[in-house]
Amino acid sequence: MKQQDAALVCFSGGQDSTTCLFWAKKHFSRVEAVCFTYGQKHSLEIEVARKIAADADVPFQLLDVSLISQLDPNCSLTNASIEMDQEKPEDSYPNTFVPGRNMVFLTFAAILARGKGIYHLVTGVSEADYSGYPDCRDTFVRSLNVTLNLAMDEQFVIHTPLMDRDKSEVWELSDELGVFDLVRTQTLTCYNGVMAEGCGHCPACKLRKDGLEKYLKRKEENQK
């Protein structure tokens, strides 16, 4: 039975997906979360995601897609022997790029959702992130949305609330949703597996910190 007012969120326990989780709770009467283990070096993010979902009273499911880590040995998030790029290379993507990850996540999420009668999928991808990952682009998401509908003869809708937001605007959205403090203190964005403010020097932490400072400055100026 189709549930038109239900959504499944691709959830990792990081800043973006946590913001999306609460965005979904605002827009849908029933929300579930799916988290993926894909051979990432830091499994703490799974426990963080599980706790946030439980505290938010959101059903949580973990799927094992660790085969991804066997397909490409050149990603620093899944291969501990590779030193992480601190800056984006001029002619390529940083080695934090996991080829096909969002395609796999959304495909498995759609199959899982279909079995639950859910046809709204929510993901925290954004074109505004520094990395320029190809599977975070709006054109990719729209293309995959069409493909999933054709593949299963269904009418899925993939929602991307953060697509055009930079990190400062993601912080702003979390504030509007009333979860700013939760996102700031209870999420895990750091590539080195450090909670909240993180390690401070990996690309994810730099992006998060810069966005926070930009948002707080803008908020202060608007209150004058």
Swiss-Prot record:
ATP binds at F11, S12, G13, G14, Q15, D16, S17, T18, T19, C20, L21. Keywords: ATP-binding, Ligase, Metal-binding, Nucleotide-binding, Queuosine biosynthesis, Zinc. It is an enzyme of class 6 (ligase). Zn(2+) binds at C190, C199, C202, C205. Binds 1 zinc ion per subunit. Belongs to the QueC family. This is 7-cyano-7-deazaguanine synthase. It comes from Parabacteroides distasonis (strain ATCC 8503 / DSM 20701 / CIP 104284 / JCM 5825 / NCTC 11152). The lineage of its organism: Bacteria, Pseudomonadati, Bacteroidota, Bacteroidia, Bacteroidales. The gene is queC.
